[in-house]
Amino acid sequence: MPPARPAELLPGTLDLLILRTLVRGSNHGYGIAQRVKELSRDVFQVGESSLYPALQRLTLNGYVKPEWGVSDNNRRARYYTLTPAGRKQLAAEEREFERIVGAIRLVLELA
């Protein structure tokens, strides 16, 4: 069987996944993308063209705070930290996602 190809993220889920990965602590963009890939067992692969606009949007909304730091390989990197407003937003997005998944599950079971 050929290897499964990466799946497309559902619209509106990238912010949720980024915020969720930052719950355990700050990370740089590449680290966030790798964490999403790892946790999804290689189903989701977040490209730079999606990741960095999302991080900018989350920064502008006050959900993450960027700070310059040094990565594990001794390079300068921008680290993102979840803010208290980001934690509230994450909780709201998780509730909404669960509501939508529940509705989809109902249709699949009852149709």
Provide a role label for each language-model segment.
Residues T59-R76, T81:
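Beta-hairpin "wing" of winged helix-turn-helix
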Residues P6-S50:
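N-terminal helix-turn-helix DNA-binding core of bacterial DNA-binding proteins
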Residues A4-E8, W68-G69:
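Short beta-strand/turn micro-motifs at beta-sheet edges
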Residues L82-G86:
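Accessory beta->alpha helical hairpin/"wing" motif in late/C-terminal subdomains of nucleic-acid enzymes
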Residues K88-A111:
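Amphipathic alpha-helical dimerization/coiled-coil segments
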Residues L51-L58:
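Basic amphipathic alpha-helical segments that dock to polyanions
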